[in-house]
Amino acid sequence: MAKNSNKVRKNTNKENNFKRLAENRYAKFQYAISETIEAGIELLGTEVKSIRNGKANLRDGYCSFRDGEILLLNVHISPHKNVGSFFNHDPLRNRKLLLHKKEIIKLKSNTEKKGMTIVPLSMYLKGSWIKLTLGVGKGKKLHDKRQDEKQKSIKKEINSVLKR
């Protein structure tokens, strides 16, 4: 006998489940982001536990190239509190980012332009994997920051008037 093929399957796609673990709002203020890219990150077990508890700080982080690889530098992930100091990780260690070679080459060519840099924008869970959103951007000058603040305040005023 043939099996009943009319059964409806539930969509249990893990890729639709996103949980933001850390965000770098300062980078969006400090840089004019022109491009974003998703990257995996090579972590230790205690780092994963700390990140899931929300103990990651992306504010001072940036990316660098070494030996054909891209490294995440100066991102602080606090040591896990329930593990002894011998088994814990260094909070500011360099972490390798997992990208395809073509993506690394593209990012390297973008950063060779004057003033361009790669900064982490957010860290989130995608299924059971911890992913990082990287932004390629150029540092803003003081007058650019002031102009952005003016535009934000104008948008807020317009939205408040429209809600009335």
Curated annotation (Swiss-Prot):
It is found in: Cytoplasm. Signal peptide: none annotated. Keywords: Cytoplasm, RNA-binding. The keyword Cytoplasm applies. GO terms for molecular function: RNA binding. Residues 145-158 have a biased composition (Basic and acidic residues). GO terms for cellular component: cytosol. It comes from the Bacteria. PANTHER family: SSRA-BINDING PROTEIN (PTHR30308:SF2), TMRNA-BINDING COMPONENT OF TRANS-TRANSLATION TAGGING COMPLEX (PTHR30308). HAMAP family: SmpB (MF_00023). Belongs to the SmpB family. NCBIfam families: PRK05422.1 (NF003843), smpB (TIGR00086). Required for rescue of stalled ribosomes mediated by trans-translation. Binds to transfer-messenger RNA (tmRNA), required for stable association of tmRNA with ribosomes. tmRNA and SmpB together mimic tRNA shape, replacing the anticodon stem-loop with SmpB. tmRNA is encoded by the ssrA gene; the 2 termini fold to resemble tRNA(Ala) and it encodes a 'tag peptide', a short internal open reading frame. During trans-translation Ala-aminoacylated tmRNA acts like a tRNA, entering the A-site of stalled ribosomes, displacing the stalled mRNA. This is SsrA-binding protein.
